[in-house]
UniProtKB/Swiss-Prot annotation:
One Gene Ontology biological process: malonyl-CoA biosynthetic process
Chief location category: cytoplasm
Family statement drawn from the similarity comment of this UniProt entry: Belongs to the AccD/PCCB family.
The protein's name in its UniProt record: Acetyl-coenzyme A carboxylase carboxyl transferase subunit beta
Location within or outside the cell: Cytoplasm
NCBIfam families on file: accD
Cited function: Component of the acetyl coenzyme A carboxylase (ACC) complex. Biotin carboxylase (BC) catalyzes the carboxylation of biotin on its carrier protein (BCCP) and then the CO(2) group is transferred by the transcarboxylase to acetyl-CoA to form malonyl-CoA.
Coiled coil: none
Lineage summary: Bacteria, Pseudomonadati, Pseudomonadota, Alphaproteobacteria, Hyphomicrobiales
UniProt GO MF annotations: acetyl-CoA carboxylase activity; ATP binding; carboxyl- or carbamoyltransferase activity
Length: 301
């Protein structure tokens, strides 16, 4: 069978001029089932054109889209111990790291960059959810701390884009240590007088929600994002009650005062710039009243 698969079939395909078609050319909308060509999805910032559903956006694409002309300085990835607990579940942790690095072309879940958004200098930190669920381990924690230190030294704001399932279980207590470490880093930035803005994306859960993801001066959220600590199913089983419709979505949190604004992905750079100008007491153009609610909200914060 291997001989047929590895030799005969490729020879026949080459003779007939047939090519193997990648499986991920078409993306299915989770809400409507609509099939979207991957190039069209990428060109629309990973938002389904018809339904407006916000798909998960790769970290590299997020940074390139955020900064002016896609120009920014990538902050270095810190070196930490690899698999210090020699952890193994159904698979070796070292193998999970290797596979995730091949899949995402990243060293770990965090990417950070220094650049300008509509002329305002800032540091942006982005989670890559496809790297072990965007989980927070030693490497991610150290990268976040270093990014906050860079923003403090540059005397500029920091914008966080969390997308995570929480702490990385394969690193045990070493992962949990990153929660207080990142919290201290947030406090140091705030003590320096610089704003800290969080843009909550889908999903933001677990220990990340319990630490730096909910410590911002202003919290924006993308439409339909799942935001919470424990999952909806776990809460229902624990309480033995049915939760409200839309529970743990960004719109539900906005209605209940946990989020300041729900902002479409296309509007995030402009909204961030306008809010940051108010927080840093810089002139704000009012010619375009898009997201004027953000201005009023930030001014009263």
């Amino acid at each position: 069978m291997n001989w047929i698969t590895n030799y005969v079939r490729p020879r026949i395909n080459s003779m007939l001029g047939r090519r193997e078609v990648p499986e991920n050319l078409w993306i299915k909308c989770p809400e409507t089932g609509e099939m979207v060509f991957h190039k069209d999805l990428e060109g629309n910032k990973w938002v389904i054109p018809a339904s407006g559903y916000h798909m998960k956006m790769p970290a590299k694409a997020r940074l390139a889209d955020l900064f002016d002309n896609g120009d920014y300085e990538s902050l270095p990835q810190p070196k930490v111990a690899q698999d210090p607990l020699k952890f193994r579940d159904s698979k070796k942790y070292s193998d999970r790291l290797r596979d995730s690095r091949l899949k995402t072309e990243q060293e770990d879940t965090i990417l950070a960059g220094l650049g300008k958004v509509q002329g305002l200098k800032l540091v942006a930190v982005v989670h890559e959810f496809n790297f072990i669920g965007g989980s927070l381990g030693m490497a991610a924690g150290e990268a976040i701390v270093k990014a906050f230190e860079r923003a403090t030294s540059e005397k500029c704001p920091l914008v966080m884009f969390p997308a995570s399932g929480g702490a990385r279980m394969q690193e045990g207590i070493l992962s949990l240590m990153q929660l207080p470490r990142t919290t201290v880093a947030v406090d140091l930035l705030k003590e320096s007088g610089q704003p800290y803005i969080v843009v909550l994306t889908n999903p933001t859960t677990g220990g990340v929600t319990a630490s730096y993801a909910m410590l911002g001066d202003i919290h924006l959220a993308e439409p339909g994002a799942e935001i919470g600590f424990a999952g909806k199913r776990v809460i229902e089983q624990t309480l033995r009650e049915k939760l409200p419709e839309g529970f743990q979505t960004s719109e539900y949190l906005l209605e209940h005062g946990m989020v300041d604004m729900v902002v479409k992905r296309h509007d995030i750079p402009e909204t961030l710039a306008r809010v940051l100008k108010i927080l840093t007491k810089k002139p704000v153009s009012v010619a375009n009243n898009m997201n004027s609610g953000a201005i009023a909200l930030a001014a009263s914060a």
